Amino acid sequence: SPTHPKQYSMLSSNKNILETLSVLRQHGVHDFVLCPGSRNAPISHSVCQIEDFCAHTATDERSAGFMALGMALATHTPVAVVVTSGSALANLYPAACEAFYQHAPLVFISADRPAAWIGQMDGQTMPQEGALGKMVKMSVSLPEDNLWHANRLLNEAMLACKDRLPQGPVHINIPISEPVYKFNAKALPDARGIRLRNISPWHKTPENEQDCLVLPQGRTLIVIGQLHITEQAVPFILQQVSANFRIVAENLSKTPTPDCTNPCQIDWTRMKRVDCLITLGGHIVNKELKEFFRKHRPKEHWHVSPDGAVA
């Protein structure tokens, strides 16, 4: 039955749990079906303290999976299922199969033991990453020592679940080291959310206002990575925007236009912070350019690509 708890208790101190819930909230997840267990207790407890979330309970994981499936099909929004470690995850396989072929946006969240404990005769342990096989569009296991990487994996999973058609189930595995039951966080972090937008071809005018992308205020820089010589429209487009934006082009970009600056010609130690970074093309080779943006992260990063890859 659904419950709407009040804000009266602390959230888990585990950074990956907080990051997961923050990213899911940004991607529109509202309903969670919670299953019993000890390793997943800090996830379930935290869900029940957040006003934006609605918690439902089911004692059997197989039933929980199909309960969430029905909710996702009825609401056309992603629904999450939270289970503990070990064979509890395997009980979600029937619902994963059904969701995969019905293109239902389900998010299977499994708590896990630390990776070093797997295969060491510890209770309720098994290899959980990829346990749902080909019946999920994406399966990720969050690294415990790299929050930025965990955030990227979470966003990629949610984009695969709801934005990359057809929709379908994904699996997020969260290894949780001791202390498991430590609760001292007052609120969710403002985690980075990655959006996927389909835009009109460059030669077409957007049909409505929603198709227009609005740049944030501040300094915008366009960086061009490796391109194929066949992408002949790029120089023309750059010529149109060069009056308003600075353009930096790698040698591998093959963009013979005077409107572009080679990154080797820039003193990156004196470069001012950029508010919006727009990238297109493939690999960036220049080391100073990459180090600058890793140290001085822009407020927004737009990556333009045919397949909407996260970079």
Predicted regions and their residues:
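Conformationally flexible catalytic loops at phosphate/diphosphate-handling active centers
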Residues: 11, 156, 160-217
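Glycine-rich phosphate/diphosphate-binding loops that line cofactor/substrate pockets in enzymes
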Residues: 19-29, 71-76, 158-166, 209-220, ...
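Short glycine-rich anion-binding loops that position phosphate/pyrophosphate groups of nucleotides
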Residues: 38-40, 84-88, 112-114, 175-179, ...
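Short gly/pro/ser/thr-enriched loop/turn and capping motifs at secondary-structure boundaries
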Residues: 41, 62-65, 88-90, 113-118, ...
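Short beta-strand segments
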Residues: 82-84, 105-112, 133, 143, ...
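Glycine-rich, anion-gripping cofactor-binding loops and their flanking helix/strand elements
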Residues: 91, 224-306, 310
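Conserved thiamine diphosphate
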Residues: 124-168
